[in-house]
Amino acid sequence: MSKNPIHIIGGGLAGSEAAWQAAQAGVPVVLHEMRPVRGTDAHKTDGLAELVCSNSFRSDDAENNAVGLLHAEMRLAGSLIMSAGDANQVPAGGALAVDRDGFSDAVTKKLEAHPLISIQREEVSGLPPADWDQAIIATGPLTAPSLARSIAEATGADALAFFDAIAPIIHFDTIDMDTCWFQSRYDKVGPGGTGKDYINCPMDKDQYLAFVQALIDGQKTEFKQWEGTPYFDGCLPIEIMAERGVETLRYGPMKPMGLTNAHNPMVKAYAVVQLRQDNALGTLYNMVGFQTKLKHAEQVRVFRTIPGLENADFARLGGLHRNTYINSPTLLDQSLQLKSRPGLRFAGQITGCEGYVESAAIGLLAGRFAAAERLGQAPSLPPLTTAFGALLNHITGGHIVSDDEPGKRSFQPMNVNFGLFPPVEAVKIEGKRLRGKDKTVAKRHAITSRALGDCRQWLGLPAPTETAEAAE
């Protein structure tokens, strides 16, 4: 058993979680983060686990939502990212959203204080040297060009890429609350919430149609060197959605369902723009689903046509950057190791998962796998029935391009979802098969119940009833 540390390149969500898991297992870690020595197009600070896009970890409903289930599994596994998120949550309906600065600060302080973690602020411009016999590359979607080239050369394949976008953030005191109102969709109460966690900006039909046209006509930032790079459907720029059809937005991020105008409850809005709290103080709100590649001056002009935002002061305007990821199913084994170089693992968005939580989850697994090998043990893979296992299986075993479709790129970034889980047997109540919505709900409950039970068993944790009895 070697006493060499595990070297982790990248101090984002995946790298931070990987470092924490390995150190908690008793293995020394060197975490390499290039900021502030070298910055990126999206990062604004040198804090670890900085959230560069949304401040939302999405749904926290572990019974009905796949990402909520992943939250629960990560908490069971002692996730640093989830504990920091829980400690810095801000109201967001049924979602878990966080104060981005407080969250990053909490992660940074925890890692700096851990006796087995050393943080080195430096750029790693190539693949780890041979004497780094256990290493994890968790450089994320904004991997530095020199390292990206080294990865491409080592794998014999060009990195895949897609566009990702950032939504604007607005100062709360510049929002007209005589026009807007506080309400969560369907008054849903989430973690740390009240059922009135979003600011809603209503539009009538004429305002909506004019807004859609303004999005389409607005001047966009050009990225000619990235032509042919696809968008990730879960993070489409608002103007791209507008171009797909005049009704697309009001059935997407601007849907009015479940919302009643507190100032005029008898009149139903044709469309609604929602703003979500971005920091614990409640002084900043981000525009939900409003990722954009509009030029900055155009963003100010167009977004100030939204009722209630006529005098909006923007703390941050939207932007666009390119994400890179590798063809993981062909390059990585089940424990996230590069097949051509044992001991070198990849974690986070660079593996082809999408989302903060998913990236951290893959970092969690990579850290555990590397620590196990350092301790002379075989990595313990999570069951396919868990959210951990379903996501890992998608990354390392899903969507390999077939020989008869050589030109088709089938592996693309994906959020965790119930379609990645093994099916469950048809759920029956009193011997009768369920149908419609009841069937869907029962199926999800069966998947999540099975997942949590199998996750506890994988982690060596007692069942919930046993925990309760032990506490007594």
Swiss-Prot record:
Transmembrane segments: none annotated. It comes from Mesorhizobium japonicum (strain LMG 29417 / CECT 9101 / MAFF 303099) (Mesorhizobium loti (strain MAFF 303099)). Catalyzes the folate-dependent formation of 5-methyl-uridine at position 54 (M-5-U54) in all tRNAs. It comes from the Bacteria. Gene3D superfamilies: FAD/NAD(P)-binding domain. Its cofactor is FAD. PROSITE patterns: GIDA_2 (PS01281). It catalyses: uridine(54) in tRNA + (6R)-5,10-methylene-5,6,7,8-tetrahydrofolate + NADH + H(+) = 5-methyluridine(54) in tRNA + (6S)-5,6,7,8-tetrahydrofolate + NAD(+); uridine(54) in tRNA + (6R)-5,10-methylene-5,6,7,8-tetrahydrofolate + NADPH + H(+) = 5-methyluridine(54) in tRNA + (6S)-5,6,7,8-tetrahydrofolate + NADP(+). It is found in: Cytoplasm. Its EC number is 2.1.1.74. FAD binds at residues 10-15. PANTHER family: GLUCOSE INHIBITED DIVISION PROTEIN A, METHYLENETETRAHYDROFOLATE--TRNA-(URACIL-5-)-METHYLTRANSFERASE TRMFO. InterPro entries: FAD/NAD-bd_sf, MnmG-rel, MnmG-rel_CS, MnmG_N, TrmFO. Coiled coil: none annotated. Its main location: cytoplasm. Keywords: Cytoplasm, FAD, Flavoprotein, Methyltransferase, NAD, NADP, Transferase, tRNA processing. GO terms for cellular component: cytosol. GO terms for molecular function: flavin adenine dinucleotide binding; tRNA (uracil(54)-C5)-methyltransferase activity, 5,10-methylenetetrahydrofolate-dependent. One of its GO terms (biological process) is tRNA methylation. This is Methylenetetrahydrofolate--tRNA-(uracil-5-)-methyltransferase TrmFO. Pfam families: GIDA. Belongs to the MnmG family. TrmFO subfamily.
